[in-house]
Amino acid sequence: MYRPDIDLSSSGTMDTVSPTPASPMAGIDLRGAELTAARLRSALPRGGADVETVLPKVRPIVQAVAERGADAALEFGASFDGVRPAAVRVPEAALDKALADLDAAVADALRVMIDRARAVHADQRRTDVTTTLGPGATVTERWVPVERVGLYVPGGNAVYPSSVVMNVVPAQAAGVASLVVASPPQAQFDGLPHPTILAAARLLGVDEVWAVGGAQAVALLAYGGTDTGAEWPGFSSDRARSASSPGADAELVPVDMITGPGNIYVTAAKRLCRSRVGIDAEAGPTEIAILADHTADPAHVAADLISQAEHDEMAGSVLVTPSEDLAAATDAELAAQLPTTVHRERVTAALGGRQSAIILVDDLDAGITVVNAYAAEHLEIQTADAAAVAGRIRAAGAVFVGPYSPVSLGDYCAGSNHVLPTAGSARHSSGLSVQTFLRGIHVVDYTEAALKDVSGHVITLAQAEDLPAHGEAIRRRFER
């Protein structure tokens, strides 16, 4: 029998929950509990660090880069990561070489990923819509892409060429004219970003890549600057120039918007720069929730929980189930699979953290209530009639339906975007899409007769709000 670590049927919070020595994950019993929204938000497992705590460290970095540009960004990189590239902008020859040297199987897989993502995102394009409110009175909503976008691709525990694809594809589909990818320099590659990142950029047709990472990368994207002008060892200094970046050897043109995931320092920098540029979101650690019943395969459930825990020690893995048998079997499967997991120390820490748990509920209806309150970045539905259950989900970054739609598929080749809202923000936010990179502009076009027809109402409302000059602007048009 599965025995949860804590029973919240009457009271309690997550402050003291931890797994027992025999269980990789903590257990929470919500059976019989009153599942109000407020109570669930305080009781459900969630980790992540508070961005506010690192703002004092990040603010001087942003200020220095704003004042001194590339020199400051490169100095911070050398101090934090022990590597200082010759310049910020990567020569196009390095992109060509990275693609030529890329393992053929990886290249083929990336091409499949790109093709499938492009197919899905092409269908997200919006068309202009004109509404006619009367003779000579129209309002058109015109969709205009952001002009220049910076796409941040992290480096750390793993290399993420998939993040290049997931950020670039919707931006290109939206019609963004100028894209720059920023990724940390790597000492083992002579200060260049990881070659797989460079190869992915080249496959996507992106020719502007900056070798800069962390908070300093976000600041440099936001404020721009002047590159060092130094040559990269082994590459010609004849770097490509583009319309968005005249004299590309020198000018680092600031962007209008920054997207892409990163650590807490990257997130803090995005917060500090968002008065100057747009951002996609303040992403927290990745998370998976699985809503499963007795029909689910515990080996699959355990494997999927482990797969997201592999990202980060702060990653959240949550199973919600009305089945004690499934909870016990999944707990046993986790214990069996963990020893053979390559990144088992990282995974063990994530599964054992306060952000992860196996949650018992009374029934499937209660489970749906719980996962809607949790609002997971990734939500798997492994139940009987999974499609019907998925139709009742109102808060999730992405929903994966049935045993053959695991989150790993969405991370790479489902065609969906894997840049998704975290930390419960799926209650009010969406994942990255073509819409992220579009601005809706209302174009108002009225004739004299159309304005006259509604002028009395405008004047009345202006007087009601004590804004007489508004009404006068209407009257003067009809004075003779």
From Swiss-Prot:
- A Gene Ontology CC term for this entry? cytosol
Question: What is the protein's known function?
Answer: Catalyzes the sequential NAD-dependent oxidations of L-histidinol to L-histidinaldehyde and then to L-histidine.
Sites binding substrate sit at: 286, 308, 311, 378, 411, 465, 470
Q: Name one Pfam family in it.
A: Histidinol_dh
Which EC number(s) does UniProt give? Answer: 1.1.1.23
Q: Where is this region: Disordered?
A: 1-25
Catalytic activity entry: L-histidinol + 2 NAD(+) + H2O = L-histidine + 2 NADH + 3 H(+)
InterPro entries given for it? Ald_DH/histidinol_DH, Histidinol_DH_CS, Histidinol_DH_monofunct, Hstdl_DH
**UniProt keyword list:** Amino-acid biosynthesis, Histidine biosynthesis, Metal-binding, NAD, Oxidoreductase, Zinc
Cofactor note, please? Binds 1 zinc ion per subunit.
Q: Which residues bind NAD(+)?
A: 152, 216, 263
Pathway listed for it is: Amino-acid biosynthesis; L-histidine biosynthesis; L-histidine from 5-phospho-alpha-D-ribose 1-diphosphate: step 9/9
- What cofactor is this protein dependent on? Zn(2+)
Q: Which residues form the active site?
A: 377-378
Q: Which annotated residues bind Zn(2+)?
A: 308, 311, 411, 470
Keyword Oxidoreductase, does the record have it? yes
Query: Top EC class per UniProt?
Result: oxidoreductase
User: Which Gene Ontology biological process is one annotated for this entry?
Assistant: L-histidine biosynthetic process
Q: Which family does it belong to?
A: Belongs to the histidinol dehydrogenase family.
Claim: Transmembrane is one of the keywords in the record: no
Q: State the protein's name.
A: Histidinol dehydrogenase
GO MF terms on file?
A: histidinol dehydrogenase activity; NAD binding; zinc ion binding
State the organism named in the record: Mycolicibacterium paratuberculosis (strain ATCC BAA-968 / K-10)
